[in-house]
Regions:
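Short, surface-exposed polybasic-aromatic patches that bind anionic ligands, especially phosphate groups
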Residues: 1-353
Length: 353
């Protein structure tokens, strides 16, 4: 522990130092709190909490010539979910986590197997889990392991939630906002443990690869619209996947989910914006569009908006408008088309690009 504190105060040459975006890799301003000290996977590991601001991990190999590592991550404002676990060790394609004392049940599941039950995960007396698979950092996305945790009833009654490892010290909280219901008001994000939530994440989990190592705190899947496709009338879903970071700015990816014979048929990312309030409580209106080819071979421009959209307009190579939250118009595959929407309470909206 002394070497860990010494390295934090002044990292020596040969110590690998990393910090998630927005995290200061500087010495502590006051004595830190010790969270864990022990040997894990052949390394001596120490975890400190910098009084609600940062988590710092120091690790040095017990044998061999590997260099010590010092990792910094922001945790200011962490709550029951975002402060529930920390990465203690990563070894190849597996990781171990330190569980918070308020976690009563620890399980794992695969987002790409939404119908499979969660499996029990062993936790030792020090609060460290057995090694669990990590999402693959590249290549094929044929599974997406997550932690499914349940907090003690002394904290929040019957509260289960999902966390996933995106490469930072603090795993990322996954949530879900269901689609609009008739005569219902705006809905809030909820835990992604329901059947609709798991089915939505089964088709969008692989898009999380784009968020690795970017200091993400939480990701919400908002099912903001359903659209009946032209010619067949079968329903397609529109989701806004919003990532909030510890340092503040958010990123959104709008995904179009046409009907699929597979529960894990991936959606198509049709819009990607950074440093935006869209799809948050500060940006509750969204419009998106894409090109889609019908089984007949005809190409269409499709557009959909959230519940406050009253009319969608297409201009450019085609000119068309439709009342409500969805539009479909025949158009050549590469025809330039601009999409705008009007809101029920006034004002306009441009599409996520």
């Amino acid at each position: 522990m002394r070497r860990a504190l010494r390295a934090w105060g002044r990292a020596q040459g040969g110590t690998a130092v990393s910090a998630t975006p927005g995290t200061l890799a500087v010495p502590p301003a006051q004595p830190p709190q010790l969270l864990y000290a022990g040997e894990v996977d052949g390394a001596a590991v120490v975890l400190f909490h910098d009084r609600g601001v940062r988590v710092v991990r120091y690790a040095e190999p017990r044998a061999g010539s590997g260099a010590p590592a010092l990792d910094f991550a922001r945790t200011d404002g962490a709550d029951v979910t975002t402060g529930a676990a920390l990465v203690v060790s990563r070894d190849g394609d597996r990781a171990r986590f330190l569980m918070a004392p308020w976690i009563a049940r620890t399980t794992t599941r695969d987002l790409l197997s939404p119908n499979s039950p969660a499996r029990a995960l062993e936790v030792n007396a020090d609060g460290v889990t057995a090694a669990v698979p990590r999402p693959s950092p590249g290549g094929r996305c044929d599974s997406w392991p997550v932690l499914q945790l349940r907090s003690s009833e002394r904290i929040v009654e019957n509260h289960a939630f999902l966390l996933t490892d995106l490469g930072d010290l603090a795993p990322v909280h996954l949530t879900f906002t269901p689609g609009p219901a008739a005569r219902a008001g705006a809905r809030q994000p909820r835990e992604a443990t329901s059947t609709p939530a798991l089915l939505a994440w089964a088709r969008t989990a692989c898009s999380l690869t784009a968020l690795r190592g970017s200091g993400v705190r939480a990701v919400n899947n908002w099912n903001f619209a359903e659209q009946r496709l032209p010619e067949s009338g079968t329903p397609a879903q529109w989701l806004c996947t919003r990532a909030d970071t510890w340092q503040g700015p958010g990123r959104v990816m709008v995904q179009f989910l046409p009907p699929s014979a597979s529960l894990t048929g991936p959606g198509t990312v049709v819009g990607d914006e950074r440093d935006t309030a869209r799809c948050s409580r500060f940006g509750q209106h969204v419009l998106a569009g894409t090109r889609w080819r019908a089984p007949s071979g005809h190409w269409y421009v499709l557009a959909a908006g959230s519940r406050a959209v009253s009319r969608i307009e297409a201009t450019g190579a085609v000119r068309e408008s439709a009342a409500g939250t969805a539009l479909a118009v025949r158009a050549p595959r590469d025809a330039p088309v601009e999409l705008t929407a009007r809101l029920k309470e006034g004002g306009s909206l441009t599409a996520v690009r």
